[in-house]
Amino acid sequence: MSTSCSNPDDQVKARNDKFMAALNDATDIDLVMSFFSPDVSYSDFAFEAVNMDFTSTRDYMDKMFHAVDDLHLTQVSLTGDKDFTASEWVMTYKLKSSDKVGEVVKMRGVSLSWYDAQGLIVRNNDYSLKWSGDID
């Protein structure tokens, strides 16, 4: 799956690529959180986790990393500028514990992210759904 980027600013794509790589690594919570402002407001509407501050966002990400195996985010498209991006993605992972341990879950979503002058995420809204279709 190729990524389309409708933004001529390569720095925006590079910033997003680094963030996606940190999420895909799923082991270094400090690295992931280094992309967020201490004043972040983070919401993941699919899981009804809304208006989280920095500490709550960190806890949320850490729990996610510990609840799944083989987390992989694939960028589908990206548009935006230094202040705002809209990123479409596909995520796959395996559940570690539930009645469906090992089940591969596919999700498709969009992240809307706003950035401060330092390039840190100050607001992020994730919208996603479980996806049973092809990833491509």
Curated annotation (Swiss-Prot):
Top-rank taxon, per record: Eukaryota
Keywords: Isomerase
Keyword Hydrolase included in the entry's annotation: no
Pathway: Polyketide biosynthesis
Gene Ontology MF annotations: isomerase activity
Keyword GTP-binding: no
Family of this protein: Belongs to the aurE cyclase family.
UniProt cross-references to Pfam families, sorted A to Z: SnoaL_2
Protein name, per record: Cyclase aurE
Known role: Cyclase; part of the gene cluster that mediates the biosynthesis of aurovertins, fungal polyketides that exhibit potent inhibition of adenosine triphosphate synthase.
Enzyme Commission (EC) number: 5.-.-.-
InterPro entries (UniProt xref): NTF2-like_dom_sf (IPR032710), SnoaL-like (IPR037401)
Broad enzyme group: isomerase
